[in-house]
Amino acid sequence: MGFGTLVAIGVIVFAVVVITIILCLTCSCCCLYKACRRPQPVVTTTTATTVVHAPYPQQQGVPPSYPAAPYQGYQPVAIQPQPGMPVAPYPAQYPPPYPMQPPDPPAYHETVAAGAGAPYPISQPPYNPAYMDPQKPTY
């Protein structure tokens, strides 16, 4: 046997082993499939947290050095415009929406029917190779 034959046999054996493992892992009757698909035991640990709600110690009274009345709560105040700040009137009607895309240029048959003619000025002469400058000789 030559070296090339041994390499070919090795490649074939390797391919057969890989294909066999893939087929065995996908076939439900194979022992490798059952071993890989066996449900893993789920370990659950439960920890209980107990929260104790203790009331905050209340003050017995207002200290004598604090002459102000106790806080009575939030009193909302209407917002008034400041001088120098213009107040915009409420719009009676919303403006029309902007178009989503710019309009397309008119089709060719629409421009011809409207008499617009060519889209370029007619004063431009047509291309004429006779008017080209002769090539200058290179040195």
Curated annotation (Swiss-Prot):
It is a single-pass type I membrane protein. The keyword Transmembrane applies. Keywords: Apoptosis, Endoplasmic reticulum, Membrane, Nucleus, Transmembrane, Transmembrane helix. The chain crosses the membrane at residues 3-23. It comes from the Eukaryota. GO terms for cellular component: endoplasmic reticulum membrane; nuclear membrane. InterPro entries: Shisa (IPR026910). It is found in: Endoplasmic reticulum membrane; Nucleus membrane. One of its GO terms (biological process) is apoptotic process. Belongs to the shisa family. The proline-rich region is required for endoplasmic reticulum localization. Can induce apoptosis in a caspase-dependent manner and plays a role in p53/TP53-dependent apoptosis. This is Protein shisa-5. It comes from Gallus gallus (Chicken). The lineage of its organism: Eukaryota, Metazoa, Chordata, Craniata, Vertebrata.
